[in-house]
Amino acid sequence: MSDLLIHRHGRVLQLTLNRPQARNALNKALLTQIAEALEVAATDDSVGVCVISGNPRFFAAGADLNEMAEKDLPATLDDIRPRLWTRIDAFTKPLIASVNGYALGAGCELALLCDLIVAGDNARFGLPEITLGIMPGAGGTQRLIRSVGKALASRMVLSGESIDARQAQQAGLVSDIHPAALTDEYALKLAATIARHSPLALRAAKQSLRLSQEVSLQAGLQQERQLFSLLSATEDRREGIDAFLQKRTPEFKGR
């Protein structure tokens, strides 16, 4: 059976990590499958949103330590995994993590890379790499501090301690918490709601939101206005306004 299960739910694509014997550890093969699936979804106009999920006990417990144990310095410098993470990060449509159980190390970094995290009440997030004599290497230090702030990010990275779903929500890492048995259901429901909107507007909004973490406020405002102006020339913008005035549901075409 594949390490990545792929299911369609209307305009929502669900990618389910499927290495239960390895606690969904993210090895190169699984990262490659995720990157390839997202690249296909990016060019498929019938896909509006992607959801990445795990199993009831583990979203993903980290990188595959069996692979890492074989890496010396030259092999680490030539590792393909940074390129795989870059490919995953390049996905331009909304990406939601549906997290039950443990999201640790690379698993936490995968969740951080998503636009939204929907968590089960049994979820735990952590970056325990420091306990192995290493540090996060797939965006953990950079994305976590932008999500939860310096104090909590520093505590998690330097101590290796994890936080539960409620702490993650209070810190701004998690958007929603649900009973673990219903996490995927609610994540897919949220994804379906988002997928109803204009694909062009969703991509532009995601681009602007992500840019806000990298540039000054003034530069971000300028980019936001440029994207807003470009959307004003689209058929979807006219359809959205017409539908609102006519009190009907819009039918967006991505044009």
Regions found by a protein language model. Name each.
Residues 15, 19, 34, 52, ...:
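Terminal peptide-recognition signature
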Residues 1-55, 86, 233:
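Conserved CoA-thioester-binding segment of acyl-CoA-metabolizing enzymes
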Residues 89-202, 229-234, 239-242, 248, ...:
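Crotonase-fold acyl-CoA enzyme core
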Residues 32, 54-87, 103, 133, ...:
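Glycine- (often His-adjacent) and acidic-residue-rich active-site loop
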Residues 29, 33, 80, 87, ...:
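Charged catalytic carboxylate motif
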